[in-house]
Swiss-Prot record:
One of its GO terms (molecular function) is ATP binding. Keywords: ATP-binding, Hydrolase, Iron, Iron-sulfur, Metal-binding, Nucleotide-binding. The keyword Oxidoreductase does not apply. Belongs to the Mrp/NBP35 ATP-binding proteins family. Binds and transfers iron-sulfur (Fe-S) clusters to target apoproteins. Can hydrolyze ATP. This is Iron-sulfur cluster carrier protein. ATP binds at G38, K39, G40, G41, V42, G43, K44, S45. Homodimer. It comes from Pyrococcus abyssi (strain GE5 / Orsay). GO terms for biological process: iron-sulfur cluster assembly. CDD domains: Mrp_NBP35.
Amino acid sequence: MTIKAPALNLPGLGADPLTQRIKEKEKKWKYKVAVLSGKGGVGKSTVAVNLTAALAKMGYFVGILDADIHGPNVAKMLGVEKEEIYAEKFDDGHFEMIPPMADFMGQVTPIKVMSMGMMVPEDQPIIWRGALVTKAIKQLLGDVKWGSLDFMIIDFPPGTGDEILTVVQSIQLDAAIIVTTPQEVALLDTGKAVNMMKKMEVPYIAVVENMSYLICPHCGNKIDIFGEGGGEKLAEKEGVDFLGKIPIDLKAREASDLGIPIVLYGDTPAAKAFMEIAEKLVNKLKEMKGDEKKE
């Protein structure tokens, strides 16, 4: 039976069955990748969304979970924020939400999307304390019909708070991508995020530098607005991989407002950078798990 889903039914399920469902679903996700940042304003969600779209463009089955409960914007960035969410009732009485999908008119393998941004009006704040946030994230993991995925991408809120702990304690991440900018203040907080992932024993940790430089649209020269090389130096210092630099792209704002990932604008520097980063990530994870290259 399929019915329209209400808002998250937080009190309705016991912790044990929900935890079990998460564990069962996790078995169907080949690679689980978190995208996080030590501070806000570095373009973390932009990286998460475009990494997701790049992987789907490569032919992989991808889901993205927006774990930023208080500031969800993944759905809008993928153009599905107005999609209605339906749920299916199971024999034991629990409901599972059916995630909307984005395929951008067949340009990518359909992406499964789940975010609180599809469940509340845009101007309505979500004023929840830690316990409610924890339960919501667990339900987004365990009470959604994710199915089999090559990649589960989880977009964390900035910082090192409850949401991150909840996910890391609920599933076994394969990788953590930490997003920074070249600015010194961003790099300080990025180091904290890297060390948190180390303490959580995430097998593969890498840094991506966003807003690395601007290509002047008039003269074509490269302009290092926020400095140069900070992300790469930090990765070297922390002993983690550096996956690449993403330039400031003047089309990115337009793409984001339209709900189209910039990676689908194939002739742009940012699109090329995202594709290269996605390819590096795939190769690293396959090497780590001993998988053969996808045909």
